[in-house]
Each structure stands twice: as C-alpha cells, then as structure tokens.
C-alpha cells in the first residue's frame, strides 16, 4: 500500500507509521497551550521525531467538542512559521490540520505535504481545488455535525455502513475533481459526532470501513471515550489504553496512527508487527 503526498510516495505496505500531534493552540483538549510559540513547538516536534514519528501533524485550531472556529489569519500565523521552521531542518512528512482552504494553501507554501481535514473537504468549497492543484496527500475524516455541535446527540442507523458509504462517496467526488486516488487516506473520526458505542463499533470494523483500498488513519489518542470506559477523567490514565488500541488497530491493518505520545505507540506497532511476522 502506498500513499502519495506532495513530497513523494510513502510506502506503508509493511511498517505502520506514527503521526505525531503538534497543536499550536491555547485550547486543544489534551495539550492546549503547551506548544505555543514557534521555537517551543519546534522543540516538541524534534522530540517526537527522535522518538520515531514519521509524520508531524500541525494544527492551529482546536477541534475538541464545543470548540469555536478561529479566523484563518490567526490559524496561519500560528502554523505557517512552525511548518517553515520544521521544513528547514527535516525532510519527513508535515501535515496541516485544517478545514480552511486559505490555511491549507499557506501551509503547503510553507512546506507542508499533507492536508488533514476533519470536515472531509466539505467545510470550504475551495479546499478541493487547493489539494488537487498542489498534489498533496489528503486525509478525509468523517464527522457528523461540526466541532461545536458534533457531540450533542449523534445518531446512526448503522455507523459502520454509514462511515464506509461516506468514504465511498468522497472517493468518487474527490477523484472526479482532480485529486488522485492514491493521495487519499481515510479517518473514521473516532469521537467526532459519535457516542461510546459508535466509537467501539468502528474500532471493531477498522479492517472493513475503507474505500478503494485506501489507507486508514486512526486518531484515538487520549480521547474521552477511553475515560468513559475506565471511569476516569484523568488524561494521563488514557495513555496506556491508547497504546492498546494502537496495537489492536495494527492487527486490523491500520497503517497510520495519529498520537500524542510517540515512542510507546511506535514500540507497540513494532512489537505487533513482529508478532504478525512483518519485516520493515
């Protein structure tokens, strides 16, 4: 399996890759305010790279439940300097986490290779054109509602079928407007417009929800459904369960994992792959 990005082809046919989360926001649910300022953000990016991250996902707007949008200019001012700084010193893949075409365009100009859009390229009508023209990799996430409304009362007749059908529709629509099929990657959007049972149903079905044999990116790091299962609101108590989900997802064929704590998830993936008989 390969994933085509602006920087070239990423081969994920054998070894899964970890995408390190770098939020340059004051209000993200897990690490809001921890990495504000370009140099502080770069220090954390370097740490994640040293721990084995193959991709760094940089976001300037929180998408936690109930969050409000940030103006594009503010999002650009938070993210573009970090992307440009990281690009000067690292040749790995950089992703911009945004639903705004203007932010994506600025990030790609600064050196990003991938656009990670929680709206599935539906929030901004200009986003498909930006992605198609640049030749970047594209992460298409499923979300019911918006970050502000998504957790109010999510309802599905069959969440697995509906998410898969969403990916199938996005594959048809986006390739028809010029985005290459090999540039697409799908994210089921765990915690985005889903309740606990919806999240668990999707995790059980990770090996049968994609479209066009495109890779799945999974983002479950420290999410609230873990705390609900464990009966705790302590974020630190969600780290080991995150690692357990990462290993289980790799068994189901998930090759891209978006996490906060890079090293333990990389080690969980390598151990799982050793058990599966996968060589790098």
Question: Where is each model-derived feature located?
Answer:
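Catalytic domains of carbohydrate-active enzymes, especially glycoside hydrolases
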Residues: 43-59, 252
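Conserved hydrophobic/aromatic pocket- or pore-lining residues that grip, position, or stack substrates
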Residues: 22, 52, 115
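N-terminal binding-site loop/beta-alpha segment at the start of enzyme catalytic domains
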Residues: 11, 16-39
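Short acidic capping loops at alpha-helix termini that bridge into adjacent secondary structure
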Residues: 92, 180-183
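SAM-dependent methyltransferases
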Residues: 1-15
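Active-site-adjacent loop and "lid" segments of alpha/beta metabolic enzymes
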Residues: 3-7, 30-44, 63-85, 90-91, ...
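Conserved, well-structured ligand/cofactor-binding cores
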Residues: 3, 18, 23, 28, ...
């Amino acid at each position: 399996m390969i994933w085509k990005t602006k920087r070239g082809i990423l081969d994920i046919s054998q070894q899964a890759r970890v995408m390190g989360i770098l939020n340059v926001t004051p209000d993200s649910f897990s690490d809001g305010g921890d990495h504000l300022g370009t140099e502080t953000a770069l220090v954390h990016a370097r740490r994640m790279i040293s721990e084995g991250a193959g991709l760094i996902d940089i976001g300037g707007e929180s998408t936690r439940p109930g969050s409000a949008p940030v103006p594009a200019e503010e999002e650009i001012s938070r993210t573009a300097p970090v992307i440009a700084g990281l690009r000067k010193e690292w040749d790995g893949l950089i992703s911009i986490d945004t639903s705004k075409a203007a932010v994506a365009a600025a990030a790609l100009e600064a050196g990003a290779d991938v656009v990670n859009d929680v709206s599935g390229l539906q929030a901004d009508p200009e986003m498909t054109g930006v992605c198609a023209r640049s030749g970047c990799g594209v992460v298409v996430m499923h979300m019911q509602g918006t970050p502000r409304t998504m957790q109010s009362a999510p309802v599905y007749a069959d969440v697995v079928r509906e998410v898969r059908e969403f990916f199938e529709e996005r594959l048809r629509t986006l390739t028809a407007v010029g985005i290459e099929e090999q540039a697409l990657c799908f994210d089921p959007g765990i915690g985005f417009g889903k309740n606990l049972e919806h999240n668990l149903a999707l995790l059980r079905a990770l090996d049968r929800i994609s479209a066009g044999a495109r890779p799945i990116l999974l983002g479950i790091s420290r999410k609230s459904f873990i705390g609900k299962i464990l009966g705790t609101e302590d974020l630190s108590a969600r780290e080991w369960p995150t690692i357990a989900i990462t290993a289980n997802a790799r068994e189901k064929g998930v090759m891209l994992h978006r996490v906060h704590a890079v090293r333990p998830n990389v080690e969980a993936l390598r151990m799982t792959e050793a058990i599966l008989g996968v060589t790098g």
